[in-house]
């Protein structure tokens, strides 16, 4: 029997990409899975596909009331919460400082940080009491942009660096009751979109990066699928396999950190 059998897992952004892969994996592990998903169509698809195995709630991660509404349903269904996975996010399609108009940069910043940072903070706030009671865990999705430049523009990169600080602070504040960790995947097959303020809400990451381009920069030389990254989340959520880790961020970068030096700077053609 899996360590996660009957564990109550709450995942944001479970309708596509990595979030959907996490929903699938935790259901396979025997967990009671719930998700907060912005898209009504994706909520309907989740319910049709997984039936009674999923509690799919339509809502916005930038709205505390939506978190609370989802959590109330989770506690009614399961009586507890064992792990919160903050995963919903948006990307900036490498929108650069120089080429982005100031007004757009400002509005894009607020929209992106509201989702990528405030969304995590509000989720942590809503879930903390239940996780303290269960002595559970939080896991937040980062990115290779939490460690390296060039995985996005300044908006996205700054948001993921901010999330690392949030993980450390929450791990400190919630110890010893709640373990708080992060997983930073590299580029993958995903429907990740951008901010509406940047005109990117209908543009997915795969329209900016081809599978060949992603595979070419990775020392492991393959194009990752979302399911390739679910293992670290399962390990971190497991009470038996992760009693000792908190404030830890797993850099699941397919070897990016071991690359040799190729480019001195990204602005040589300015």
Curated annotation (Swiss-Prot):
Binding-site residues, substrate: 143
Functional pathway: Aromatic compound metabolism; 3-phenylpropanoate degradation
SUPFAM superfamilies cross-referenced by the UniProt entry: NAD(P)-binding Rossmann-fold domains
EC number: 1.3.1.87
GO BP term, pick one: 3-phenylpropionate catabolic process
Name of a matching Pfam family: adh_short
Residues that bind NAD(+): 10-34
Job description of the protein: Converts 3-phenylpropionate-dihydrodiol (PP-dihydrodiol) and cinnamic acid-dihydrodiol (CI-dihydrodiol) into 3-(2,3-dihydroxylphenyl)propanoic acid (DHPP) and 2,3-dihydroxicinnamic acid (DHCI), respectively.
Protein name: 3-phenylpropionate-dihydrodiol/cinnamic acid-dihydrodiol dehydrogenase
Species the sequence originates in: Escherichia coli (strain SMS-3-5 / SECEC)
Taxonomic lineage: Bacteria, Pseudomonadati, Pseudomonadota, Gammaproteobacteria, Enterobacterales
Gene: hcaB
């Amino acid at each position: 029997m899996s360590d996660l059998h009957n564990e109550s897992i709450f995942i944001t952004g479970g309708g596509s990409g990595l979030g959907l892969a996490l929903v699938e994996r935790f259901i396979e592990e025997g967990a009671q899975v719930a998700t907060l998903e912005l898209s009504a169509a994706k909520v309907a698809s989740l319910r049709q596909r997984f039936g009674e195995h999923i509690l799919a709630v339509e809502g916005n991660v930038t709205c505390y009331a939506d978190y609370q509404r989802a959590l109330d349903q989770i506690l009614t269904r399961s009586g507890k919460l064992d792990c919160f996975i903050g995963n919903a996010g948006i990307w900036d399609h490498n929108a650069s400082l120089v080429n982005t108009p100031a007004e757009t940069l400002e509005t894009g910043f607020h929209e992106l940080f509201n989702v990528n940072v405030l969304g995590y903070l509000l989720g942590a706030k809503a879930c903390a009491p239940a996780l303290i009671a269960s002595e559970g865990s939080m896991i937040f999705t980062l990115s290779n942009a939490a460690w390296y430049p060039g995985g996005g523009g300044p908006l996205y990169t700054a948001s993921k660096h901010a999330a690392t600080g949030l993980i450390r602070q929450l791990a400190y504040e919630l110890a010893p009751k709640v373990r708080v960790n992060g997983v930073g995947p590299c580029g993958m097959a995903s429907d990740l979109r951008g901010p509406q303020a940047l005109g990117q809400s209908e543009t997915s990451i795969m329209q900016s990066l081809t599978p060949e381009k992603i595979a070419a920069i990775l020392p492991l030389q393959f194009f990752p699928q979302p399911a390739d990254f679910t293992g670290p989340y399962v390990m971190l959520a497991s009470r038996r396999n992760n009693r000792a880790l908190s404030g830890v961020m797993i850099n699941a970068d397919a070897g990016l950190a071991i690359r040799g030096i190729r480019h001195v700077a990204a602005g040589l053609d300015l």
